[in-house]
Amino acid sequence: MEEFDSEDFSTSDEDEDYLPSGGEYSEDDVNELVKEDEVDGEEQAEKTKGKRRKAQGIPARKRKQSGLLLEEEEDGKEDSGGSSSEEDEEEQEGGLGSENARKKKEDELWASFLNDVGPKSKAAPGSQTKVAEETEEISSNKPLVKADELDKPRESEKVKITKVFDFAGEEVRVTKEVDAASKEAKSFLKQTEREKPQALVTSPATPLPAGSGIKRASGMSSLLGKIGAKKQKMSTLEKSKLDWESFKEEEGIGEELAIHNRGKEGYIERKAFLDRVDHRQFEIERDLRLSKMKP
């Protein structure tokens, strides 16, 4: 058995180291081997060519894509630039239009203000013409207003009134200033208007012949004249008050006396205060009596 095993191992080694010679291969085997080698070489060459083509094609496509992107971006920028320029022009036109409208509004407001107040040196030319026309109309209407004002006296105007009184057989004339719209001034004006026609009637223009009827007429007219010309009598108290008022006007102490009387030492103010106190006390007592009388 051992010999058999050693022989087997030797044969296996010999088989591995055995190389057949070229003469032992047939032509068909050689042709097949050559074809297989050619096919393998072609496949490897195609693989390497395909890899190179892939490597060369990727950056070209990328470049083409980047070129397209850049062109699109440039076109977009140009479009955006054109649109932005158009928008800027539109905004400028809109700004000019708004400024013009604002200026027109300011001019109109200024003109209306000038119409209410009067013409100014810095006014617009259109407003100046309007104001000039209005001033001309006002100046043309002024004389009519003045004529009306002259016919009717104002309320603030003062009118001097002279009254004649009889004091102990003496004629006393009193002059004072009152408002033109007061009752006293109106009555005085009416009285003067009545006295004017009477004076014209009583003064004879031509001498009349003597006669009984004429004498009676003249006697009656004289009596009526005496009755109409009867003077109002003045009492002693009124005369003393009149003298005191005239003295104050001559000396110019009216304001000083008024200030003095308003103070604590003034007799008139004290008397008025005491009168108010008495009146208030009377009202309180009356209210108490009425409250007790109620059931």
UniProtKB/Swiss-Prot annotation:
<dbReference type="GO" id="GO:0005604">
    <property type="term" value="C:basement membrane"/>
</dbReference>
<feature type="cross-link" description="Glycyl lysine isopeptide (Lys-Gly) (interchain with G-Cter in SUMO2)">
    <location>
        <position position="146"/>
    </location>
</feature>
<dbReference type="GO" id="GO:0000776">
    <property type="term" value="C:kinetochore"/>
</dbReference>
<feature type="compositionally biased region" description="Basic residues">
    <location>
        <begin position="49"/>
        <end position="65"/>
    </location>
</feature>
<dbReference type="GO" id="GO:0044346">
    <property type="term" value="P:fibroblast apoptotic process"/>
</dbReference>
<feature type="modified residue" description="Phosphoserine">
    <location>
        <position position="212"/>
    </location>
</feature>
<dbReference type="GO" id="GO:0008360">
    <property type="term" value="P:regulation of cell shape"/>
</dbReference>
<dbReference type="GO" id="GO:0042127">
    <property type="term" value="P:regulation of cell population proliferation"/>
</dbReference>
<dbReference type="Pfam" id="PF07572">
    <property type="entry name" value="BCNT"/>
</dbReference>
<dbReference type="InterPro" id="IPR027124">
    <property type="entry name" value="Swc5/CFDP1/2"/>
</dbReference>
<feature type="domain" description="BCNT-C">
    <location>
        <begin position="214"/>
        <end position="295"/>
    </location>
</feature>
<keyword id="KW-1017">Isopeptide bond</keyword>
<feature type="region of interest" description="Hydrophilic">
    <location>
        <begin position="174"/>
        <end position="213"/>
    </location>
</feature>
<feature type="modified residue" description="Phosphoserine">
    <location>
        <position position="112"/>
    </location>
</feature>
<feature type="compositionally biased region" description="Acidic residues">
    <location>
        <begin position="1"/>
        <end position="18"/>
    </location>
</feature>
<feature type="modified residue" description="Phosphoserine">
    <location>
        <position position="83"/>
    </location>
</feature>
<feature type="modified residue" description="Phosphoserine">
    <location>
        <position position="80"/>
    </location>
</feature>
<comment type="function">
    <text>May play a role during embryogenesis. May modulate tooth organogenesis since alterations of this protein function affect tooth organs size as well as individual cell fate and survival. In embryonic cells, blockage of the function results in increased number of apoptotic cells, reduced proliferation, alterations in cell shape and fibronection matrix synthesis.</text>
</comment>
<keyword id="KW-0597">Phosphoprotein</keyword>
<keyword id="KW-0158">Chromosome</keyword>
<feature type="region of interest" description="Disordered">
    <location>
        <begin position="188"/>
        <end position="217"/>
    </location>
</feature>
<feature type="modified residue" description="N6-methyllysine">
    <location>
        <position position="215"/>
    </location>
</feature>
<dbReference type="GO" id="GO:0007155">
    <property type="term" value="P:cell adhesion"/>
</dbReference>
<keyword id="KW-0995">Kinetochore</keyword>
<dbReference type="InterPro" id="IPR011421">
    <property type="entry name" value="BCNT-C"/>
</dbReference>
<keyword id="KW-0217">Developmental protein</keyword>
<keyword id="KW-0488">Methylation</keyword>
<dbReference type="GO" id="GO:2000270">
    <property type="term" value="P:negative regulation of fibroblast apoptotic process"/>
</dbReference>
<feature type="compositionally biased region" description="Basic and acidic residues">
    <location>
        <begin position="188"/>
        <end position="197"/>
    </location>
</feature>
<protein>
    <recommendedName>
        <fullName>Craniofacial development protein 1</fullName>
    </recommendedName>
</protein>
<feature type="compositionally biased region" description="Acidic residues">
    <location>
        <begin position="25"/>
        <end position="43"/>
    </location>
</feature>
<keyword id="KW-0137">Centromere</keyword>
<feature type="modified residue" description="Phosphoserine">
    <location>
        <position position="84"/>
    </location>
</feature>
<feature type="modified residue" description="Phosphoserine">
    <location>
        <position position="246"/>
    </location>
</feature>
<keyword id="KW-0832">Ubl conjugation</keyword>
<feature type="region of interest" description="Disordered">
    <location>
        <begin position="1"/>
        <end position="153"/>
    </location>
</feature>
